[in-house]
């Protein structure tokens, strides 16, 4: 079948959206599989290792009464290892397969560093989304695998104590996250890590003007080191 895309090649290559999103799906036939309803191995696989979360965000739909059993936690590494091992490693973009994220916080899994390092050792460019609350220096000493990430994105929920608390219901959230990010920016240059650091910020209804304050927050964090939040 033909999907009817007739864009000029040079124009496509100059557009990041086409380069990073549409072209890969066209090249590996994923769009045709989707239209025809036939099976294809996923281009992206989300890994959700979080066991709990320190925040109680107003927009989150998780069940606060649900808990994992200790046996589930103990075998979590083997479960994610199996998913990684079963990857066929086919196609031009297989290395960019995995995203660690979730409705719960990934850093609450005691094997998170091990999961990341294993994926990295198998040739995958591991990426993770986190709220950054647990990203302390003591945590990093125990979870050195964090530094094997290709990319880490921090989800921001405000720009000061009040705005952070309004969303997360955690009074310490803003101060702890900002401190952790500053310490992380100072720590990375002392290692051999190639990690890239970025942020996400959810624009809640009526808060689009807050983006300026978020930029100021990022500017403050970036002032402490040559290693910076870069996207």
Which stretches of residues belong to each language-model region?
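Conserved C-terminal portion of the radical SAM core fold
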Residues: 91-101, 122-127, 147-156, 176-231
């Amino acid at each position: 079948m033909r999907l009817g895309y007739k864009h000029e090649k040079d124009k496509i290559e100059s557009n990041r959206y086409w380069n990073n999103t549409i072209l890969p799906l066209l090249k590996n036939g994923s769009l045709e599989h989707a239209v025809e309803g036939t099976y294809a191995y996923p281009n992206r696989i989300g890994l959700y290792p979080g066991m709990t979360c320190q925040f109680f965000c107003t927009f989150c739909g998780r069940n606060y009464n649900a808990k994992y059993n200790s046996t589930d936690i103990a075998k979590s590494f083997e479960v994610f290892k199996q998913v990684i091992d079963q990857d066929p490693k086919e196609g031009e973009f297989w290395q960019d397969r995995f995203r660690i994220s979730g409705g719960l916080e990934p850093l609450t899994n005691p094997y998170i560093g091990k999961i990341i390092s294993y994926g990295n050792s198998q040739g995958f460019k591991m990426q993770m989304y986190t709220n950054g609350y647990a990203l302390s220096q003591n945590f990093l000493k125990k979870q050195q695998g964090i530094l094997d990430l290709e990319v880490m994105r921090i989800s921001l929920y405000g720009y000061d104590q009040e705005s952070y608390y309004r969303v997360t219901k955690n009074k310490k959230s803003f101060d702890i996250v900002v401190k952790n990010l500053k310490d992380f920016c100072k720590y990375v240059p002392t290692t051999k890590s190639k990690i890239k650091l970025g942020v996400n910020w959810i624009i809640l209804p009526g808060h689009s003007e807050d983006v300026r304050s978020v930029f100021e927050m990022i500017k403050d964090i970036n002032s402490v080191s040559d290693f910076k939040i870069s996207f």
